[in-house]
């Protein structure tokens, strides 16, 4: 029986978060000093990013604003202008990198596309996400593509209705328990969790090991054996 397979973009279809982690390392070195340990700096940045999450802020520009806000709470006022200028440089240096697909994506999609309906549901800044989709070379393999500001239960319900999906045969596939797995399950979809060691810390959440509507796989290529 054909299913509808919906794929996350960042760190599922293509690599993403490692660019942000490298930027965070530079930010940490930039603002370090006094009583602020590396762990405390990361916690402060996480606090700011968590608040931005709920406003739908994502992408490099939002990340830059978050670093600026965190820096304002960490460094002395006299030093702040220099630090903020350096933060802007960190964001500029992130640039527009070439899209690097995760291992096995092309061959796996080619095989799955012959049996199932494929879609992309990715969260973030629309311009950035569409640039990745267009630059990935795989957009033509998908029937449905949606860039959203929030991945919550309401979003998945909206997609089910708008795309006329059957939740019982629709699977959300991704690396984020918080964005891909839990809200999709709350909306009645099934889910495939593909862990990625580079997953953003704020995307982590506990999954119910007894939930038989979630499959955990070790790699993207393993989807072929399941579908």
Q: PLM features: residue spans?
A:
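Active-site periphery "cap/insert" segments of enzyme catalytic domains
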Residues: 95-110
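Glycine-centered short loops/turns at secondary-structure junctions
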Residues: 115-116, 188
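Asp-based, Mg2+/Mn2+-dependent phosphohydrolase catalytic module
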Residues: 1-3, 106, 110, 125-227
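A metal-dependent, Asp-based hydrolase signature
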Residues: 43-93, 111
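Active-site neighborhood of HAD-like aspartate-dependent phosphohydrolases
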Residues: 1-44
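Short helix-capping segments at alpha-helix termini
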Residues: 33-37, 76-78, 137-141, 164
């Amino acid at each position: 029986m054909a299913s509808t397979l919906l794929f996350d973009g960042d760190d599922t279809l293509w690599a993403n978060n490692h660019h942000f982690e490298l930027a965070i390392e530079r930010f940490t070195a930039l603002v370090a000093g006094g009583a602020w340990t590396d762990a405390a700096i990361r916690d402060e940045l996480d606090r700011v990013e968590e608040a931005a999450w709920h406003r739908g802020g994502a992408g490099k520009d939002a990340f830059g604003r978050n670093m600026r806000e965190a820096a304002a709470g960490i460094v002395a006022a006299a030093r702040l202008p220099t630090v903020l200028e350096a933060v802007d440089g960190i964001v500029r240096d992130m640039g527009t990198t070439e899209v690097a697909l995760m291992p096995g994506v092309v061959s796996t999609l080619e095989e799955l596309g012959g049996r199932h309906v494929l879609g992309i549901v990715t969260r973030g800044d629309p311009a950035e996400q569409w640039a990745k989709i267009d630059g990935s070379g795989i957009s033509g393999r998908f029937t449905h593509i949606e860039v959203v500001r929030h991945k919550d239960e309401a979003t998945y319900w909206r997609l089910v209705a708008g795309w006329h999906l059957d939740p019982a045969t629709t699977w959300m596939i991704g690396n984020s328990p918080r964005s891909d797995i839990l809200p999709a399950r709350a909306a009645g979809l099934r889910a495939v969790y593909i862990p990625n060691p580079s997953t953003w810390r704020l995307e982590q959440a506990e999954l119910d090991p007894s939930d038989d509507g979630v499959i955990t796989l070790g790699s993207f290529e393993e989807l072929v054996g399941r579908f």
